Each structure stands twice: as C-alpha cells, then as structure tokens.
Amino acid sequence: MKVAVYPGSFDPITNGHLDIISRASKVFDKVIVGVLINPEKKGMFSVDERVDLIKRVIKPFNNVSVQSFSGLLVNFMENNDSNVMIRGLRSVGDFEYELQTSLMNKKLNPNVETVFMMTSLEFSFLSSTAIKQVAVFGGCIKELVPDEIIDDVLRKAKEFN
Amino acid sequence: MKVAVYPGSFDPITNGHLDIISRASKVFDKVIVGVLINPEKKGMFSVDERVDLIKRVIKPFNNVSVQSFSGLLVNFMENNDSNVMIRGLRSVGDFEYELQTSLMNKKLNPNVETVFMMTSLEFSFLSSTAIKQVAVFGGCIKELVPDEIIDDVLRKAKEFN
Amino acid sequence: MKVAVYPGSFDPITNGHLDIISRASKVFDKVIVGVLINPEKKGMFSVDERVDLIKRVIKPFNNVSVQSFSGLLVNFMENNDSNVMIRGLRSVGDFEYELQTSLMNKKLNPNVETVFMMTSLEFSFLSSTAIKQVAVFGGCIKELVPDEIIDDVLRKAKEFN
Amino acid sequence: MKVAVYPGSFDPITNGHLDIISRASKVFDKVIVGVLINPEKKGMFSVDERVDLIKRVIKPFNNVSVQSFSGLLVNFMENNDSNVMIRGLRSVGDFEYELQTSLMNKKLNPNVETVFMMTSLEFSFLSSTAIKQVAVFGGCIKELVPDEIIDDVLRKAKEFN
Amino acid sequence: MKVAVYPGSFDPITNGHLDIISRASKVFDKVIVGVLINPEKKGMFSVDERVDLIKRVIKPFNNVSVQSFSGLLVNFMENNDSNVMIRGLRSVGDFEYELQTSLMNKKLNPNVETVFMMTSLEFSFLSSTAIKQVAVFGGCIKELVPDEIIDDVLRKAKEFN
Amino acid sequence: MKVAVYPGSFDPITNGHLDIISRASKVFDKVIVGVLINPEKKGMFSVDERVDLIKRVIKPFNNVSVQSFSGLLVNFMENNDSNVMIRGLRSVGDFEYELQTSLMNKKLNPNVETVFMMTSLEFSFLSSTAIKQVAVFGGCIKELVPDEIIDDVLRKAKEFN
C-alpha cells in the first residue's frame, strides 16, 4: 500500500493544489494532505479553517484525506507510514526552493523520497498569495479556487480589507 | 491613439524606470505612469511624494503623465482607455514574477496586453531597494536616480536612518 | 504609423507564433513577419515554403505581411522604416538568449527597440523543433500548428522520415 | 500494479541514472527502463550495447527491466500498460526542458503522468556527455558510472579517440 | 600580500560558510570574515555572539580573522587594505542576487573585485534560515553546522521557540 | 606565488575575455591563458591563430602569458603549478554549465579551485559566437573585440562567408 503525503500551507487551497491532489490520487494508493502549522506566519485563514475548506473539496476522492501537523515534516510522514512526499512545480523559482528543501529532508531522513509533478498548464500561474491579492482588490477568483469555496475566500478577503 | 500604462511602486523612481519611460514614449502615443497604492507595504516615500518626484523627472516627455491608483491594475487601465501595459525586465527572477503576473492579468481581463522591455545594460542592476540601502549607508547615488531628485532621496534616507 | 517587425525561422510557423502575430497586430499599426535566411542551418521547409505557409495563415489580419531577409536584422528593419522588433518569451532559457540578442542589436543600432510578449499559456510549451519531432514520429499535431497547414507539415515529415 | 517507465538515451548509463532507478524501484511496483532509438543522433554506444550495459547493472533490482523503443514515448508506455513516466531533475536547465516535454506528452496523451525525482546530491553534476569527455581525455571515471561497466566505457572511449 | 574579505550575516555560521573560508584561505594570503551589522534585521544571534562563534571555528586557519562592521561594505574593505571580496554561490537565485550586488559595489568603488566560489556539493543545500528552522523543530543539525557550535545553536533555538 | 589559469576556446578572444584577464591580473601573481584544443569542434580560427591573437592583446600585462593545451584541464594546471582556475560568468546559463564543470574538475582533482568573476556590465552580452555572426553579416564589431584584432576577424569572416 503506497501512502503519499502532500504537504503545504494551503492558505487557501487553489485549483493548482486540487489538480496535484487529483493526479496524485491516480498514482498512489492513498494521499494525505498535510496542512503545516507555522507559528511564524499568520495566514488569512486559521489552520482549522484551511483543513475544513480542504475536506469539502476532496470529497470526490475516496483515497484522499487531510490533517494538520506541526514540527518536522519527516516525522509527520513517519507517523503516517509514508516515505513518499509529493510537491508541485510551477517555475524555476519553485524548482530551486524545492531542490534545497528535498535535500534537507533527505539529510534528516534518508528513507524519505520526494516526488514532483509539474502543475498543469492552466494553473501554472496560480499562487495562494496572488489569489488573496485579487480577492482583496475585488477581482474575480472563479476558476482560480474550487467553486465550493469561492464565497468563503471573498468573505475572508472583505474582513482582511 | 495607443495609450500604454507603466505601473509600479516607484519608491523612489530610478534611472532604470526613467530609461523604460523614455524608450516607451517613442513606441506608444501616450504613456501613463501608474503609482500603485499598496496598503500592505509602507515605503520610504508616501504615494503623493512619489507622484511628485515622477512629475519633476518626466517634464522632458510631452506624451507622458503620472497618476496614483489603488485596486486592480486592469481596472485602472480600463478607466484610462488603455489595453497595453509596459513592464521592465532585468533578470530571470523578474521574468518569472512578471510571467505569473501577466498571466493573472490576462485571466482577469483578456483584452489587456503586457509588453516587456529589457532594462538598458547600464541600469540592469538597479532596484529601488538597493538604492535606498546605499543612500541609508551614506553611499553615492549619482547616476542611480535622476539628478533632479538626488537631494530628496538623501534627505529621506537620513530621516529613515 | 508604428511598424513592428516579428523576425524568426518559422520552420514551420506554430500556433505560438500566430498567437504573438495576432496580439501584436492589435498593439501596432503594421506588423511585418521576417523569415530569416540562415545559410548555416538547413531546415525542414525551404525559406520560400515557410513564407508561403505564413501567407496562408495571416490572411485574417489586414495589417500583417511577410518577407524573407538575409544579413543583419537591424538593416532589414531600417529598410522597412521600423524601429520596433517583437519577440515572444516562453521560458527562462528564451529570456536569457533574447536578453543577449536584444543588447547586441541595441549595440548595432541604438534606435532599435525590442519589445517582448509572453507566449499565451496554452502555447507556452510549443517549439517548431518539438512539433517536427512529434510529426516525424506520427503523433497528432492538431492545435499545435494552424489547421490550414497541418497536411503540409505531415507530408514534409514523411519525406523527412 | 503500478508500472512506471524511465525513458532516456543512456549513452552510457551513469550512476545518476542508477540512483533514480534504485529509488523509483521502491516507489513503484514495476520499473521499465526505456532506451530511445533516435535516428538523428549517433551515440558512442549502439542501442543494443546500451541495453546490454543496463541489463548488467539492474540485476540487483527484481522489479526493474529494460527495453529499447522507437517512435512516440506515449505509445511505448501504452503498449506496456503504464501511465506514469519517471524523469530525473538536476538543474534549472533540466527543469525547463522537462516542463516543455511533459506538457507536450500530456497534450499527446492526457492519461500520461510525468513524475520527477531530484538527482541525489553526489550525482547532480553527472551527464553522459561530460563522462564521455573525461573518458576520451583519459580521466578517471570511477564513481561516475557503475563499476561493472567502467572497462566497457574506457574501451569504447579509446575507439572513439 | 593579497587580503580578501568574506562578508555575510553568519546567523549562525554553517558548514557551507566554513567550506568557503577554508578554500579561500588557500587562495589568498589573508582572509577577513566580515559580519554585517544590519539594523533592519534582528537575527537569532546578536552580532557579538556571531563573531564569537566564528572565532571558535576559524582557529585552525592562521591566516583567517573576523570583525563586525556597519555601513558600506566597500568602505570596510578599504579600511582593511583589501580590494577582493569573496562570495559563495549555491544556486541560480544566489547568482542573480550576487550579480546585482557585485555590479552595485563596482559602481560604488571600481577598484573592488568580487570573486565567487561554488559551494561544495555536500553543502550546496545549506542556508542559515533552513538550519534555524530544523533546530527550532528539534531536528538533527549535525554536519550542517561546525561541531563546536551545535550546542549553542540548539540552546538558542529553544529560547527562540 | 599564486598562478591562475584562464581556460577557454577564445575563437576569437573578445573584450569580455580581455576584461576578465585584466581584472584577474590584479588579483593573482601570474595568469596563464589556456587555449583548449578540442578535436570535436572546428572553429573559425585555428588554435595557433587564436594563440597569436591573444599574444598581441595581452602585451600590456607583464604577468599574463598564453599556451594551447589538449587533454584534461586539471592535468594542464598541474603541469603549470597552478591550483586556481578562473572562469567568467555572464548569465544563469553560464552559471549552471560552470557549476557542473567545476564539480567534475573537483572530482578529478580535489586540489583544484575554480574561482569566478562576473563579466563587466558592458561586456555581459558578448560571446564569440554572436560576434562571428555579426562579422559574417557585415556588422560593426568595434568595442566587441580588442581594436588590434578587428581586421583579422573581419578578414576571416569574409573567408568563412
């Protein structure tokens, strides 16, 4: 049974994230979306709110689940019997950051394998940061985030503004 | 009549910005310098101060004007009957950021065209951030910012320091 | 009257090229597609065949024409009263090559301005080289090259194979 | 049963290739090494010689096999009931080439998924080209190619020289 | 007598930094490690603490010393009769930042020469930022920072956490 | 006595090469320009012609000499009591190629240190290839190659054309 972990901030989940989840669910037996609790970064959504948004959009995938975690990612993977981590790649900037991160994780736990997927073309320019900016400035975020959570993002953007 | 918008923070305007403005003024009938009001980022100069500095240095160009704006850039362009945006490119890092931003703008308004110019060689290493650091540390900023505003930048750097 | 030149090998023209031509035709008064005669590189199509393929696909644009040229690009532009060159950008690799080429052209003729457009998302992975490989191996090239010239490319690929 | 294909030229197989094969064999149920027959490129080793070298070094992995193939990669995968392709990533240059290739393959067959692994640190500077150059100039290729095939590479380099 | 300055934040010094110091000490007659006092950035260690950590790990090198400095780097170099600055390069991101910084320094003082060394392979993924994160999350930092200062970093990480 | 080797094809030497030679001559006690004899690549100038052109332009530097060499670069350095190699860096593309080459050289001879200098701004877009193309197409190569050898390059370009 191949269990893969897909870690990130997901503040909020975007169609780019969902694209990776959907494709990974066909390559691995089980996919766990891991929402990182980062004490140094206050996001737009709380960690619990992010987990809730993800739960709603992964319903169509019966081999995908979601949990939040804190501390070292390699420890979270070990606790869930997983030695494969999935990461999306959109650009050269992503590539260099991910190369350094995967080498550090390999140093911390040589059994952990990081596997990458290129984000699908139509989502390759998406980032949670860019989407939050568009939402705060009142732009249309249709096709950028899953339809089920558009209202949640616009409501939060108003509070933020 | 081809109206092009050149958006940015311009905190402060540098010789690299002025180089793009001068070259764009020969390619398009009218150029509007758009100073973005970004509530999340407090700069060295206020937005009004930046607009004033730009007004002083664009005097030689009779087809160039300046305005500040807030909200979505594509809306600002629409209000000024412009469907062409100009951006300068200095490095690979610029390129990737601009690629993602131009694709998001295209998503928000398919009629908007982003056109890029490579910054001239002698200005390719300039950034407002680097110039502010040199000024704060008492370095010489001649040839980095237009001569007309050197004193303004040094005075502001002293307040900042 | 703003005349812009769009130079390249076009061996053959792809939907990525046509995308740039179509968008440039809305930004400039006249666009001249310049097919470079490069004695050092024997392509799949002869230069005349490439010019003919381009003529067929630019019919919908009344402000776009095509010519072949040899020698220095800056001289070809001068002979056509143009001081603006358009180039498409798909990737970091493109960016660096284009940065060096545009700086060399600026050196040869300081009046020449190179203006860049990012290739539209859906064409950002296209290159004449990749399309020729797919055609030679019998793959489907629909949506990769303009419909009008699909048969020409497949016929040439067979000869080539 | 998850079957993954690892395609390449392998002229010759390097320790970087073997590193990817070994790690992939722990992530997927079956791994097929596919040696591409490229009529346009004459290598140092013939395709059959490359297949033979690979056979010798993959003996320790009971879920790994090797075949040569010609034509489109997506067709080769379909004939082997595989919808997952593995590719190694060493550098930014690799990343951009692989991004364009994976998008073209996705266009040719939307069911094909390309999954990437970063080459392990100690092999990240290896390429068949660089190793052939070192061998032709009489340099030491220990730790660059699997021990079992060092003599084959040095013998071929002498013929080549 | 060739005096080279190796400037940085060193918050804290890593094995990547020490690798550059060791190799530079064989190329230049004297190496001065310069710890930059940056009023805008509060680090994990104070500047004095960083100088102390460096003093302990450079003991084996009799031609290497350490000082903190504030203001312009080119002025610090002039005060120490040095016109050569050493910088380490790990990635494309480093390269672009360093290219712009070295061109700005050349502008401020044409006599200053920046010389670069590629970080050794086994340290190429290290950064003070990544190491602090691992330490704060209780991960093992052996082989990431010099053995002599591991306890200092873990103690500081606890305070930080 | 610090002896540094500056290896390359130099087909022909450009002002970018001369810029690196001039700056390196101030950092190291002796600089040897090494012209690589590459059997696989036929250049515009023969190796002897390249050595002659270099001899003419390095006359102002009394600590700079030139030799051609074949085989492994690390062996050439050892024969000249040098453990420092100088390379110029112009772009991200250069950086990645040089990173892999320097790591391979380090593998072949751990005592060899590769030291890099960023090409000066005004020469950052120069390459022997681009200059040869401009010369073959009859463009002006003043300020691109040293004045002393302009006629040699134009004469050779005519033969080539």
UniProtKB/Swiss-Prot annotation, chains A, B, C, D, E, F:
Instruction: Give the cofactors, semicolon-separated.
Output: Mg(2+)
* Residue positions binding substrate: S9, K41, L73, R87
Give compartment(s): Cytoplasm
Keywords tagged on the record: ATP-binding, Coenzyme A biosynthesis, Cytoplasm, Magnesium, Nucleotide-binding, Nucleotidyltransferase, Transferase
Report the principal subcellular site: cytoplasm
Q: Which GO terms describe its biological process?
A: coenzyme A biosynthetic process
Tell me which EC number(s) this protein carries.
Answer: 2.7.7.3
The domain of life for this entry's organism is Bacteria
Catalytic activity annotation: (R)-4'-phosphopantetheine + ATP + H(+) = 3'-dephospho-CoA + diphosphate
Q: Extract one GO molecular function annotation from the record.
A: pantetheine-phosphate adenylyltransferase activity
UniProt cross-references to InterPro entries, sorted A to Z: Cyt_trans-like, PPAT, Rossmann-like_a/b/a_fold
Q: Kind of enzyme, top EC level?
A: transferase
Q: Show which residues form the site (Transition state stabilizer).
A: H17
The residues that hold ATP are S9, F10, H17, G88, L89, R90, E98, F123, S124, F125, L126, S127, S128, T129
Which function does this protein serve? Answer: Reversibly transfers an adenylyl group from ATP to 4'-phosphopantetheine, yielding dephospho-CoA (dPCoA) and pyrophosphate.
Q: What is this protein identified as?
A: Phosphopantetheine adenylyltransferase
- Name of the gene encoding the protein in the UniProt record: coaD
